[in-house]
Amino acid sequence: MCGIAGYSLGPESAVEPTVAARALLTGIAERGADAAGYAYRTPAGRVDVHKQRSGATALLERIRVPEGASQLLVHVRDHTKGHPSLAANNHPIRHGAVVGVHNGVIDNDDALFAVYGIDRAEPGMTVDSEIIFALAEISRGRTGAALEQLYGTMATAWLDEGRPELIVARGLGRPLWLGRGKHELVFASTRLALELVESYVGIKLRKSELPEGTVVAVENGKLVAKDSFQVDRSFHDDPLPAVRAPDEARSCRERLATLHVAAA
């Protein structure tokens, strides 16, 4: 059980990128403490990735999102496949030009790597989530069809250095919330994360859950495309509690409040 979050900001948005990133990280901190990380698209179009083997609190003060970086991905990990001792297994995951985050389990990743003859991005990688971003890279323009090949559970998002949009998708069995502001679109595994953005950034978001079997493209804080894909509901996994790291949640909330007061 992991946590994902992120945003797309329009050019007229007054949201401070780092403050929003910290709020989102805090809002998903409870969902895993094996690793934490974030990625953003630079104004030049490159996606920079930062991750470490820790819970959210240790990352909170280190997050720096530069002005002009209007797209963000955030992740906390409660690992299943792919040990966190190998940094490449932790999120955000890069496969070629695609960088993404995922909450869930993909059961047929090895089979799909073999069918398509795709090599792992780095030696020793075993994380199942990588197949999402490998398929995304070879299936540009056919995202829904690519997602239909995945067998498992999924809430995911990615940035592609070859395309301008942020892609957000929800498959089977994992929560994913969208928050729409005047010039912003924010997503997260928890409603709490969106509420923290509202509180610390000072914007109002219209909150709703993304339906299962839905993929959206977001650019400049606006939804620019939406598609549906078939979800294979025959997959079943053992349910896990959503709160995997309660101590991280508490300490992250306390530290976020302290940082906010210090910056005021």
Where are these regions (language model features)?
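Conserved short alpha-helical segments that host acidic/polar catalytic motifs at enzyme active sites
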Residues: 1-264
